[in-house]
Regions:
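Acidic catalytic motifs of isoprenoid enzymes
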Residues: 1-192
Length: 195
């Protein structure tokens, strides 16, 4: 049986190992909030690893693994607990802070897009993807951060998520090309630059 403490520790390890910039930023938060931010990172990392790090596994198998992960998360959430080392902390965080589960659905939809969509024609097309891959992360964070006005905080939280994602796209251009993906919009950016 996985303990809640071990689950939060695993999420923290994932955040520290793979999201060093995001991990460092958690030190700006009150100590009691940090484990919950690590849990959200753990969820996102788990899904991202299914999409990107299964090596030469066929797309259909990765899609099935991602769907299974989503179904397991939904079932664990309904049960109020999980035996999974990462999901146990995620379920606890979602329930403790009443995070909108629809945010996780949108995130998983965007991760599924990564399996089949290799390029984005326009910035508007890319924004549809980033709504679930980035903006939604800001929405997930808000209940943990407890702003005084949730409605007022939502747009900048979404915008910050998108800004982080765009920065990652620029930083990871080579890595994304190796995976057969181009996140820079063809028409809006590359076409104008004649790249």
């Amino acid at each position: 049986m996985t303990t809640l403490e071990a689950s939060y520790a695993r999420c923290r390890e994932l955040n520290k190992a793979y999201g060093t910039t995001y991990y460092a930023s958690t030190f700006l938060l009150p100590r009691a909030r940090r484990p919950h931010v690590h849990a959200l990172y753990g969820f996102c990392r788990y899904a991202d690893d299914i999409v990107d790090d299964l090596g030469p596994v066929p797309v259909a198998e990765r899609a099935a693994a991602l769907a299974d992960f989503g179904a397991r998360f939904t079932a664990d959430l309904a049960a109020g607990d999980s035996d999974d080392l990462v999901l146990k902390a995620v379920v606890d965080t979602v329930l403790r802070f009443d995070i909108d589960v629809e945010c996780f659905d949108r995130f998983l939809r965007s991760m599924t897009m990564d399996l089949t969509v290799a390029t984005y024609e326009t910035f508007d097309d890319l924004m549809l993807y980033m709504d679930g891959s980035a903006a939604v992360i800001g929405e997930m964070m808000l209940p943990i951060l407890e702003p005084s006005d949730l409605g007022l905080a939502r747009p900048p939280a979404r915008d910050l998520g998108v800004a982080f994602q765009l920065t990652n796209f620029l930083r990871d251009v080579g890595e994304d090309l190796d995976r057969g993906r181009v996140y820079l919009p063809q028409e809006d950016q590359i076409g104008r630059a004649h790249v």
